[in-house]
Amino acid sequence: RAYEYYSQINPAAKNDSIDLYEIEPYVYAQNILGDEHPQFGLGRNSWLSGTASWCYQAGTQWILGIRAEYDGLLIDPCIPSKWDGFKATRMYRGVTYHITVINPKHVCKGVAKVTVNGKQAEGRLVRAGEGLSEVSVEVEMGS
C-alpha cells in the first residue's frame, strides 16, 4: 500500500488533470484546493514545500528499502508484488553500491538471500565496503 499512496501524491500522477492542477507537473504543491472550494483541484504555492525531500526518503529508504545504518546498508524492500525487481545505485561512505533486487516469487516484502560481490551475506545488512570503490549487491526477495 505504501507504493499506492506514494504514487497518488506524486506530481506526475496529476498529468491527466494538469488543466485543473495548473502548476508545474514535476513539483509538489504546498496545497491543493479541496472539493468545497470553487476551484477544486487547483495546486498552489509550488516550490514552497519540503515534500520532495520527504518523498525521496520514503521512496528510497522505505519502498526500495535501501537504508544507511552504522555498520552498512540495510536492504529491506517493500515493493508492489507485481514488480519483477529493480536496480539502484547508492553511494555510501565513498563506495558505489550497484544493487539489483529480483522478485521471482512476486512478494511485497521479505528477503530470501543477499549476495555481495558474489558471496552470500548473513542477513539483510551489507557491511561497509572498506577499501573498495564499487560493490555489487544482489538481493533475492522471498520468505
Segments and roles (model prediction):
Residues 1-143:
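Non-catalytic C-terminal accessory modules of carbohydrate-active enzymes
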